Regions:
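Generic alpha-helical transmembrane segments
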Residues: 73-85, 150-169, 230-233
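Internal transmembrane alpha-helix with an interfacial aromatic "cap," most often the third helix
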Residues: 72-135, 167-168
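Membrane-interface segments at the starts/ends of alpha-helical transmembrane spans
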Residues: 54-72, 137-153, 212-228
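C-terminal transmembrane-bundle signature of multipass membrane proteins
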Residues: 35-37, 184-263
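Membrane-proximal helix-loop-helix units in multi-pass membrane proteins
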Residues: 116-182
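Alpha-helical transmembrane segments and their helix-start/interface "positive-inside/aromatic belt" motifs
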Residues: 2-34, 100-116, 174-189, 242-243
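N-terminal topogenic module of multi-pass integral membrane proteins
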Residues: 1-92
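Membrane-helix interface motif
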Residues: 37-57, 90, 123-138, 198-211
């Protein structure tokens, strides 16, 4: 049994040594995919916003807007559960013995996850959120499911949540720093803060049912959006943790990492 285990570990170590430390293709493809997708969404809004998005009782509204809502919600829920399940199913069950080079490679993979997560947060919590405020300051709503809400609340928010949970689960199941040494407060805040913006949508829409107010972040009803949004600054804490671990791995393992030995 020990011979088999030793042979398997030797083969794994050889495969790790051949794998590049950083593969930028997933990061590039993820960035391009998100940006192209949202540019397409923005063009769709431009074409069908005024044409079919002003009267929720019109059949065009159901055709061009409610159909999107009916499709995106189950797709996002399934994606969330499938990603969490896959990350857990394929987790590394021996994090205490991850090779230094492999751990470094996984750190770079996590950085790619975080960068794509940041891009998704920009589109959802910044671009489409500001757009939503502009829409509702110029158009009188007759439904909570306005065109801008269908894109902002029920598309862009769940999308960055799915990407965020992917990165969080990757860290918890692949990296010893996050998976076998307790919980990282910084990473928990980085994921939970933006995530909590989504359930806060319910409070926001309930409030708008009773009060008419300008779509400004200084309005009390919108304070929690800002509060949870600022949690994204925890990315600096996560960055410091990752950089600290990179320094630890590099010290004394230069030959494994493909680095020049320190003089």
């Amino acid at each position: 049994m020990s011979l088999v285990s030793g042979t398997a570990r030797t083969g794994e170590a050889a495969a790790v040594a051949e794998a590049p430390l950083f593969n930028g293709i997933p990061l590039i493809l993820g960035t391009i995919a998100i940006n192209v997708f949202y540019v397409g969404v923005r063009i769709y809004e431009q074409v069908f916003g005024q044409f079919a998005g002003l009267d929720s009782f019109a059949p065009e509204f159901t055709t061009y807007w409610m159909t999107i809502l009916y499709i995106e919600e189950p797709v996002e829920l399934i994606s969330f559960l499938a990603l969490v399940g896959w990350m857990w199913k394929t987790r590394d069950t021996d994090l205490a013995n991850v090779q230094p080079r492999e751990e470094m490679r996984r750190i770079f993979n996590l950085i790619s996850w975080i960068m794509v997560y940041g891009i998704a947060i920009y589109w959802g919590a910044s671009y489409f959120t500001e757009q939503d405020g502009t829409w509702h300051m110029t158009v009188i709503r007759d439904t909570d499911f306005t065109p801008s809400h269908i894109i902002e609340f029920y598309m862009s928010y769940p999308m960055y949540i799915v990407i965020g949970v992917g990165g969080f689960m990757y860290a918890r199941t692949r990296l010893p720093t996050y998976g076998s040494k307790g919980w990282s407060i910084a990473y928990v805040l980085l994921f939970v803060g933006p995530f909590m913006i989504f359930p806060n949508v319910g409070l926001n829409e309930w409030g708008h049912t009773f009060w008419f107010m300008e779509e400004l972040f200084v309005e009390p009803l919108h304070w929690m959006f800002v509060f949870f949004g600022w949690f994204s600054l925890a990315v600096f804490g996560v960055t410091l943790q990752l950089l600290g671990r990179v320094v630890e791995l590099a010290h004394g393992h230069e030959e494994l990492l493909g680095l020049e030995p320190a003089e």
